[in-house]
Amino acid sequence: MADNSSDYRALFLNDVPMMDARAPVEFSKGAFPGVINLPLMNDIERQKVGTCYKQHGQDAAIQLGHQLVCGQVKDERVNAWVEFAKANPDGYLYCFRGGLRSQTVQRWLKDAGVDYPRIIGGYKAMRTFLLDTLHEAVSECDIVVLGGMTSTGKTEVLTQLRNSLDLEGIANHRGSSFGKRATGQPAQIDFENRLAIDLLKKRAAGIEQFVVEDESRLVGSCNVPLELHQTMQGCPMVWLEDSFENRVERILDDYVINLCAEFITVKGEEQGFGLFAERLLQSLNNIHKRLGGERHQRLSGLMQTALEEQQRSGTVDLHRGWIEGLLGEYYDPMYAYQREHKAARIEFAGNQVDVLDYLRERSDKR
């Protein structure tokens, strides 16, 4: 058996398999990528033990825990832990602080003939390590902000750069009012943990300059860490440009064709299309106050007609009507205003090829 570990850096850099022994309610609030939740106690058991601890102390709480997790319940949980340990012989287990729960799991595994290491300090220590990692990266690294009008292909640029931070990818959201995906977003803590691990791995590979898309503080329901977002507001910018026609086609691909396919993959043909249509109409409705009543009504009518035609014949051509209106009348004026106020920070502007070349050269000079 490997020794119990507090080398959090190595654990995350090497994607070491980890078993989380916390209760499901704790796990759902925040965990680490790829970790499996195999709890010592379920939510109700944990609550009862916690109440007992407050009222009668640690010894009584431990005794109650053993009463609640015994017999067949205990056997089933130990069997699940044994299966995990055998499938992941190089892994580790942990609880919240690396205390009684993980030590109990470790002891019961040993009773079952399996020696398995735990992480010293548990979830709390690893979470602290990742927050420190994020702080150090923001403080020590150079950051370049990639801006541009809606749907100029900023994500396409980021995915071609080894030194990018794809906040929208980590948040599973495209960033705009229309950015929700067919699958949900991670919890806030999960978002922060994934971002910190991405930074940790890239810095370990020698990257000290990062390109990040110009985002508002909120990416859907995920908050960009305040320190990072505040730093981004003063960083140099590169502005990505593309034609109006190309941007219309990109929106058609991303927010109609691909989003519809996502919903159908997740929910099935009939239910998937209905949920896709509902999502699209709701996204437009979310900005109806900013659009104004008449404009919202007109664009909503165009969208509804396009959705009906898409469902009837499979063609998506009519969607270009509301896309062109939304870009030309709403998004472009808003982004033009923003660019004017950020002009002093823009050190380069160009199309996708030119911007990629510039950012790669800029990174090489670091």
Curated annotation (Swiss-Prot):
It catalyses: 5-methylaminomethyl-2-thiouridine(34) in tRNA + selenophosphate + (2E)-geranyl diphosphate + H2O + H(+) = 5-methylaminomethyl-2-selenouridine(34) in tRNA + (2E)-thiogeraniol + phosphate + diphosphate; 5-methylaminomethyl-2-thiouridine(34) in tRNA + (2E)-geranyl diphosphate = 5-methylaminomethyl-S-(2E)-geranyl-thiouridine(34) in tRNA + diphosphate; 5-methylaminomethyl-S-(2E)-geranyl-thiouridine(34) in tRNA + selenophosphate + H(+) = 5-methylaminomethyl-2-(Se-phospho)selenouridine(34) in tRNA + (2E)-thiogeraniol; 5-methylaminomethyl-2-(Se-phospho)selenouridine(34) in tRNA + H2O = 5-methylaminomethyl-2-selenouridine(34) in tRNA + phosphate. Residues 12-135 form the Rhodanese domain. Belongs to the SelU family. Keywords: Selenium, Transferase. GO terms for molecular function: transferase activity, transferring alkyl or aryl (other than methyl) groups; tRNA 2-selenouridine synthase activity. Its EC number is 2.9.1.3. Involved in the post-transcriptional modification of the uridine at the wobble position (U34) of tRNA(Lys), tRNA(Glu) and tRNA(Gln). Catalyzes the conversion of 2-thiouridine (S2U-RNA) to 2-selenouridine (Se2U-RNA). Acts in a two-step process involving geranylation of 2-thiouridine (S2U) to S-geranyl-2-thiouridine (geS2U) and subsequent selenation of the latter derivative to 2-selenouridine (Se2U) in the tRNA chain. The gene is selU. This is tRNA 2-selenouridine synthase. The active site is at C95. The keyword Transferase applies. It is an enzyme of class 2 (transferase).
